[in-house]
Amino acid sequence: MTLEAIRYSRGSLQILDQLLLPKQSRYEAVGSVHQAWEAIRAMKVRGAPAIALVGCLSLAVELQAGAGGPGLAALVAFVRDKLSFLVTARPTAVNMARAARDLADVAAREAEREGATEEAVRERVICCTEDMLEKDLRDNRSIGDLGARHLLERVAPSGGKVTVLTHCNTGALATAGYGTALGVIRSLHSLGRLEHAFCTETRPYNQGARLTAFELVYEQIPATLITDSMVAAAMAHRGVSAVVVGADRVVANGDTANKVGTYQLAIVAKHHGIPFYVAAPSSSCDLRLETGKEIIIEERPGQELTDVNGVRIAAPGIGVWNPAFDVTPHDLITGGIITELGVFAPEELRTALTTTISSRDGTLDGPQM
């Protein structure tokens, strides 16, 4: 078994089919943007950072094979249209949309250079996608380390170990590696300061039971799986020190879209006086939206709720509502928002990120908010 969600080399992309985990580890070749769209939509690959990476790398594979053109204008349009198509696969997560804007701008700027060639445009876009892969791994390690230190200072300033509850899957399988919220747990474990981790089952797709539990067992991190409906009991009776979750989109006021069930976790955590953290790269922050009310929430097929492994478990004829995400209001994020740039209170996020981005040169290395 492996925790490597994405295998990439110039001109070749493979993804780990996460629908088969933990029973089977099988890689699937992705040779086109259309194949990537299908894999993302089917949730063979999931997690906001991984979705963006697979989408953009699939475009890089096509460009390496000479797709696009002929002519600079046609090539730039090809890049823009392919990226726009990828955004439609799962619209709630902002990472793919941001990467699409950035890469389209890169292609357009390169095409405007004096003496520009199709080969140069392709090479520039490919290099930028490869840089994204490396940057995501660096950012995740920073998130893990910064989050672990902040959490320990908040809940265990005199030393000792902490117990953390998390939701869905935010680890190596959802990113280029290491993870965001699960990266914080990894960092706590490596410091010898993690007493225990609780992970939710995360219905209806069971990302917690299938993927997070798999990662925790793989790395021998002490952990217990619970159902989504057990979180209040766990906080009341199992000594939970903090809750750390990931994010698919964080907007300007700190409202956060994440896997459905996150909102209720935050409510229960506040009731019990337990710090609630969101761990996400700055690429998951969307300062163009003011509040969570503006976030488009993806709704998934009802069959995902009524059937398990192809066997129907719900009464025939029952109606189904299956939103993939919910929005946690910023005032419930009591621990802070952990990014690779630091840990910020929700009300600090806009200023902190705007200040950081304005000090950069506006290239792909500095995500445009």
UniProtKB/Swiss-Prot annotation:
Catalytic activity of the protein: 5-(methylsulfanyl)-alpha-D-ribose 1-phosphate = 5-(methylsulfanyl)-D-ribulose 1-phosphate
Consequence when changing C168S: Abolishes enzymatic activity
Main location: nucleus
Modified residues (N-acetylmethionine): M1
Pfam families: IF-2B
Molecular function via GO: identical protein binding; S-methyl-5-thioribose-1-phosphate isomerase activity
Keywords recorded for this protein, A-Z: Acetylation, Amino-acid biosynthesis, Cell projection, Cytoplasm, Isomerase, Methionine biosynthesis, Nucleus
Signals that turn on the gene: By RhoA activation in cancer cells (at protein level).
UniProt subcellular location: Nucleus; Cytoplasm; Cell projection
Pathway noted in the entry: Amino-acid biosynthesis; L-methionine biosynthesis via salvage pathway; L-methionine from S-methyl-5-thio-alpha-D-ribose 1-phosphate: step 1/6
The family this protein is said to belong to: Belongs to the eIF-2B alpha/beta/delta subunits family. MtnA subfamily.
Protein name: Methylthioribose-1-phosphate isomerase
Active site: D248 (proton donor)
Assigned EC number: 5.3.1.23
Amino-acid biosynthesis in keyword set: yes
Annotated site (Transition state stabilizer): C168
InterPro entries in UniProt: IF-2B-related (IPR000649), IF-M1Pi (IPR005251), IF_2B-like_C (IPR042529), Initiation_fac_2B_a/b/d (IPR011559), M1Pi_N (IPR027363), NagB/RpiA_transferase-like (IPR037171)
Job of this protein: Catalyzes the interconversion of methylthioribose-1-phosphate (MTR-1-P) into methylthioribulose-1-phosphate (MTRu-1-P). Independently from catalytic activity, promotes cell invasion in response to constitutive RhoA activation by promoting FAK tyrosine phosphorylation and stress fiber turnover.
GO cellular component: cell projection; cytosol; fibrillar center; nucleoplasm
GO BP, sorted A to Z: L-methionine salvage from methylthioadenosine
